[in-house]
UniProtKB/Swiss-Prot annotation:
It is found in: Cell membrane. It is a single-pass membrane protein. NCBIfam families: PRK04778.1-6 (NF003412). InterPro entries: EzrA. This is Septation ring formation regulator EzrA. GO terms for biological process: division septum assembly; septin ring assembly. It comes from the Bacteria. Residues 99-138, 190-223, 271-300, 350-435, 471-550 form a coiled coil. It comes from Staphylococcus aureus (strain NCTC 8325 / PS 47).
């Protein structure tokens, strides 16, 4: 037993030793990778990057930047790369002692140092590339500025007449660029690449602005010297022609406004000659806005005249229509009020319309007189005609509505008479059906309903013979009688159907009287109720009796009655 225990312990120890050596082998691979990485980053070309700056002017800002990067390279080597060898050596020693965690910590520190060293290299590479790119951009901008300088100078010299009095100032501004180009060369020669960039970039923007001025100035001069004076002249003579045609344009104030605009235009060229183009554009925009306002007023007058010519005849027709309709209404009201009741307000409205129409005709005559003058402000005439058109349209609508009302009175009377005749005819027809039916007697309530309808009809007939007739009241009464008649007819139909049905049930049940005493008793009661005009109750008792001996037969009998 002891032997087995000893063997087990030995096996465990051997396994543990094997595991330790296996782990140390894995950790050894990590250390070897760190050594390989160290060998790779030692070859990073810090010096080659810096050597690219030697191709530039190693002075001034360039020299300062070069020295700073060289110093950073030395510091990075001492701070990040030099300790790596020691960290790797310590990791190997600790690994030999099987101190895995401590060995891993040393390797991690070594990798962090190498990461920092690589980052330092990347930063140096970016800085060098940035300096080289800035040098290249500076040279490109400088070459562009030299070309622009020569072209602008040549343009002013060759096309001096296009720039007017601004040509001298343009030449002066262009000449200022030459010493600034030379200053760039000095900054570049001194290695001050950042100052050189800021200087040449600012110079390029100023040249672009002056170039835009040179493109804009000929347009401004052409607008100032030719286009606007031409528009002033066209507007002046155009208004003169319109006045000859009969337009009143005093409110446009053409002469005074044009004189004011000419004065304002005279200040524009001095602004252009001083290269104050923003102020010059503002003044020109203001002049054009005022011109547009004048053109809008004139165009409004021309359109107003066309509109006046189109609407004048329409308004004339509408006024005549209103007057004729008013006369017709006055005549018709006098006739209608003898036969029909008419609200006094309707008659007053017709008289009021007459006064309003006469007033509108007077206004229209004044407008026509105004239009016959040698100078007419058509915009005012248009407004006045619009006022007339709106009012005469309202009057015509109201008069037409009133006329339709008068016509409707006759139609309503005829409709009421027709409805009354139909009521009388229908009433007699229904009553005859009641008398000719199998009823033992006409129920008293139908006699009462018939008498009520007769009374209402006589009352309405008396109102028809009276004059003037209040058509609305009469129509309402006839409508009420029609409702009474419908009720009379519906209830009569119900009674007639129930009477036939009750009679059929009793007749059918007679076959069971001998054999079923209870049926005989029920049918006797149903006959008694039938004679007393209680048809619904008679039906209930007869149905119960028949269903007790022949289920479902009552439904068959009812269907036959309905078909009849």
């Amino acid at each position: 037993m002891v032997l087995y225990i000893i063997l087990a312990i030995i096996v465990i120890i051997l396994i543990a030793v094997g595991v330790l050596f296996y782990l140390r082998s894995n950790k050894r691979q990590i250390i070897e990778k760190a050594i390989e990485r160290k060998n790779e980053i030692e070859t990073l070309p810090f010096d080659q990057n810096l050597a690219q700056l030697f191709k530039l002017n190693l002075k001034g800002e360039t020299k300062t930047k070069y020295d700073a990067m060289k110093k950073d390279t030395v510091e990075s080597t001492n701070k990040y790369l030099a300790p790596v060898e020691e960290k790797i050596h310590n990791a190997e020693a600790l690994l030999d002692k099987f101190s895995f965690n401590a060995s891993q910590s040393e390797i991690d520190d070594a990798n962090e140092l190498m990461d920092s060293y690589e980052q330092s290299y990347q930063q140096q590479l970016e800085d060098v590339n940035e300096i080289i790119a800035l040098y290249k951009d500076n040279d490109e901008l400088y070459d562009k500025c030299k070309v622009d300088y020569r072209e602008m100078k040549r343009d002013v010299l060759a096309n001096r007449h296009q720039f007017g009095e601004a040509a001298s100032l343009l030449e002066t501004e262009i000449e200022k660029f030459e010493p600034r180009l030379e200053q760039y060369e000095v900054l570049k020669a001194d290695g001050n690449y950042v100052q050189a960039h800021n200087h040449i970039a600012a110079l390029n923007e100023q040249m672009k602005q002056l170039r835009s001025y040179m493109e804009e100035i000929p347009e401004l001069i052409r607008e100032t010297q030719k286009e606007l004076p031409g528009q002033f002249q066209d507007l002046k003579y155009g208004c003169r022609d319109l006045k000859v045609e009969g337009y009143d344009l005093d409110h446009v104030k053409v002469d005074s406004t044009l004189q004011s605009l000419k004065t304002e235009l005279s200040f524009v060229e001095p602004l252009i000659s001083r290269l104050e183009l923003e102020e010059a554009n503002d003044k020109l925009a203001n002049i054009n806005d005022k011109l547009d306002d004048m053109y809008d007023l004139i165009e409004h007058e021309v359109k107003a005249k066309n509109d006046v010519e189109e609407t004048k005849d329409i308004i004339t027709d509408n006024l005549f229509k209103a007057k004729d309709m008013n006369y017709t209404l006055q005549t018709e009201i006098e006739y209608v009020r003898e036969n029909y009741y008419i609200n006094e307000s309707d008659a007053q409205s017709v008289r009021q319309f007459e006064n309003e129409i006469q007033s509108l005709i007077s206004v229209y005559d004044d407008i026509l007189k105004e239009m016959s003058k040698s100078a007419v402000r058509y915009s005012e005439v248009q407004d006045n005609l619009q006022y007339l058109e709106d009012h005469v349209t309202v009057i015509n609508d109201k008069q037409e509505k009133l006329q339709n009302h008068l016509i409707q009175l006759r139609e309503d009377e005829a409709e009421a008479e027709d409805n009354l005749l139909r009521v009388q005819s229908k009433k007699e027809e229904v009553y005859r059906r009641l008398l000719a039916s199998n009823l033992t007697s006409v129920p008293e309530r139908f006699i009462i309903m018939k008498n009520e309808i007769d009374h209402e009809v006589r009352d309405v007939n008396e109102q028809f013979s009276e004059r003037p007739i209040h058509v609305k009241q009469l129509k309402d009464k006839v409508s009420k009688i029609v409702i009474q008649m419908n009720t009379f007819e519906d209830e009569a139909n119900d009674v007639l159907v129930n009477a036939v049905y009750a009679e059929k049930l009793i007749q059918y049940g007679n076959r069971y009287r001998k054999d079923y005493s209870n049926v005989d008793k029920s049918l006797n009661e149903a006959e008694r109720l039938f004679k007393n005009n209680r048809y619904k109750r008679a039906i209930e008792i007869a149905e119960q009796a028949l269903e007790s001996v022949e289920p479902g037969v009552t439904k068959h009998i009812e269907e036959e009655v309905i078909k009849q």
